[in-house]
Amino acid sequence: MKRMIALDGAQGEGGGQIMRSALSLSMITGQPFTITGIRAGRAKPGLLRQHLTAVKAATEICGATVEGAELGSQRLVFRPGTVRGGDYRFAIGSAGSCTLVLQTVLPALWFADGPSRVEVSGGTDNPSAPPADFIRRVLEPLLAKIGIHQQTTLLRHGFYPAGGGVVATEVSPVASFNTLQLGERGNIVQMRGEVLLAGVPRHVAEREIATLAASFSLHEQNIHNLPRDQGPGNTVSLEVESENITERFFVVGEKRVSAEVVAAQLVKEVKRYLASPAAVGEYLADQLVLPMALAGAGQFTVAHPSCHLLTNIAVVERFLPVRFTLAETDGVTRVMITKLTD
């Protein structure tokens, strides 16, 4: 019988990522875990609908036995079974993030007995979660280099608070893992600005694009009008394609916040990324930790290690025989992964 891993949900940034990473790793390694103080660092601690959906999805995919899987619970015991490929559908029932639920279960399906499709309904444009276009255009090309083949499709947008969005991913078992080296970003090839609108006047998008164009030379400027019933909602994105990596940044519009202020927030974030020679942005760094750890080697550079990143690393090291080493050099932090030997 494998040992039970005990996790403190209040460690580090104290959010839901601790539990999501633990669920992924438990399904992959077969190691059971218990976590207390779930989301202790949040204003409303405990399991919300999004987190509960992730737990139920993980339970279904591997036939786990679970204790504490209920709304508001701050304690969870998870004993995994065998991961099974298949066609899965999960509904969050709110505007909670579809991609964060997918992020929980897809790594386990890299080790399944056959191909899978996972469809999640809920929120797709959430200020605190990666949108589907980030997964599709930024993360998945890097996963392919590691040897992980999955394809995400956004079937319908769902903005806060209504939700109603749908995201689906098709994924195949991994034959073998490759190491990823992301030390340098390289020269910028082009930048693309994009605005999504649903039930919001077009002049809002035009003002947002104008704000981006005032700060950056945009190769493309795209405005996409979505059906009104998918809103109201507004998202502004800016994609930076460099020689070695593509990064994508986004901001979700808010009521009573002007188009110029919304776009200026995005400009500030992109300028912060470009001011450093680091290859990887803050949020992409979080996404790379688990797949690169499964590969057992690799490295990337980030401007500054966030508390979120450090917390995720700590959880991964509890489950996998790897060590992360962080070294500051030439104005960036180099994150290196090595496999531990017996």
UniProtKB/Swiss-Prot annotation:
Keyword Transmembrane helix: no
UniProt GO molecular function: ATP binding; RNA-3'-phosphate cyclase activity
Active site: H308
GO cellular component annotations of the record: cytoplasm
Transmembrane segments: none
Enzyme Commission code: 6.5.1.4
PROSITE patterns to which the protein is assigned, alphabetical: RTC (PS01287)
Alphabetized UniProt keyword annotations: ATP-binding, Cytoplasm, Ligase, Nucleotide-binding
One annotated GO biological process: RNA processing
EC class of the enzyme, as a word: ligase
Entry superkingdom: Bacteria
Keyword ATP-binding: yes
Residues holding ATP: Q103, Y283, L284, A285, D286, Q287
Subcellular localization(s) per the UniProt record: Cytoplasm
Catalysed reactions, semicolon-separated: a 3'-end 3'-phospho-ribonucleotide-RNA + ATP = a 3'-end 2',3'-cyclophospho-ribonucleotide-RNA + AMP + diphosphate
UniProt function note: Catalyzes the conversion of 3'-phosphate to a 2',3'-cyclic phosphodiester at the end of RNA. The mechanism of action of the enzyme occurs in 3 steps: (A) adenylation of the enzyme by ATP; (B) transfer of adenylate to an RNA-N3'P to produce RNA-N3'PP5'A; (C) and attack of the adjacent 2'-hydroxyl on the 3'-phosphorus in the diester linkage to produce the cyclic end product. The biological role of this enzyme is unknown but it is likely to function in some aspects of cellular RNA processing.
NCBIfam families in the record: PRK04204.1-2, PRK04204.1-3, RNA_3prim_cycl
Family: Belongs to the RNA 3'-terminal cyclase family. Type 1 subfamily.
Entry protein name: RNA 3'-terminal phosphate cyclase
Protein source organism: Escherichia coli O157:H7
Gene of this entry: rtcA
